[in-house]
């Protein structure tokens, strides 16, 4: 028998005054997973976090945490701790006292406090910083103190509210790796809220993408990136090229002949379509292949010209206008040993992709 989820939100509705920000919202999170709630500003992700923490109450629905209905429990009675974006460290206290604060409030014995704080600081690699004050710490160190203060209480779930957004890019990348390693080491459930797609993809076991208070898709980072449910998910997670097409006929299970941009081409889909169905063929920039027009192979593809090119060190990114007028993005890994691996502005090119790399969804109006 499989274990029940550590956290379940069932048919949650939340209103602020007359505005309904969540309606019939459902979510299940497994014990011990790193789960990220991802979406643009105003999508409802922070509201979900606050409902889990107990900082807000749901107008309708139920929240189950570790088998207990906590819908009516106050925040301090829930086995949950939150790491805020600001870290919320007490400036007049040492690192040790900041981490020990929750245990002291819970009237834990002094010997146990000392042992648990020592263990928590060792976990986040700050054992030598116990006597320092917050102003003597770097941004990354403050982040780790905030996490130590949260995990020292041994919560079932740790909530992190955009807690890396204040860090610079390189430190943020470093902390992404450290957070994931720490989560594995602790074995507790992390629920992370962010608008940053890179953070979500790099750290998470699973990701929930939200928009306008609705769950758009839940899946692994790879599922979210490679097999988006709809155009919002496809466009919110990285760059995407969208080609309109119509199913001409079914060739076999999940293989179809499609008409697109003046030619017919075989496509592969992970769902069933009928002849005449309008579809979107989705391709990431890195899925496209570019050739000089005069070197175009003898198979269906797009012709166009290069509008802009950008060398990033690892890739050569090209903006291409197709004959249809549509503008697309293509990204190819740079090959310094290929003297022809470059394109000039207005260069005539031919664009293709490897069969099976496309993702096909029902057309949206």
Swiss-Prot record:
SUPFAM superfamilies per the UniProt record, alphabetical: MOP-like (SSF50331), P-loop containing nucleoside triphosphate hydrolases (SSF52540)
Cellular compartments annotated: Cell inner membrane
Membrane-topology annotation of the record: Peripheral membrane protein
Major subcellular location class: membrane
ABC transporter domain segment(s): 7-237
Keywords: ATP-binding, Cell inner membrane, Cell membrane, Membrane, Nucleotide-binding, Translocase, Transport
Disulfide bonds: none
Residues holding ATP: 39-46
Keyword Cell membrane: yes
Protein EC: 7.6.2.11
One GO MF term: ATP binding
Domain of life: Bacteria
Pfam families: ABC_tran, TOBE_2
Reactions this protein catalyses: ATP + H2O + polyamine-[polyamine-binding protein]Side 1 = ADP + phosphate + polyamineSide 2 + [polyamine-binding protein]Side 1
A single cellular component GO annotation: ATP-binding cassette (ABC) transporter complex
Entry-linked PANTHER family: SPERMIDINE/PUTRESCINE IMPORT ATP-BINDING PROTEIN POTA, SPERMIDINE_PUTRESCINE IMPORT ATP-BINDING PROTEIN POTA
Subunit structure, interactors included: The complex is composed of two ATP-binding proteins (PotA), two transmembrane proteins (PotB and PotC) and a solute-binding protein (PotD).
Role according to the record: Part of the ABC transporter complex PotABCD involved in spermidine/putrescine import. Responsible for energy coupling to the transport system.
Family: Belongs to the ABC transporter superfamily. Spermidine/putrescine importer (TC 3.A.1.11.1) family.
Name listed for the protein in its UniProt record: Spermidine/putrescine import ATP-binding protein PotA
Source species: Hahella chejuensis (strain KCTC 2396)
Gene for this chain: potA
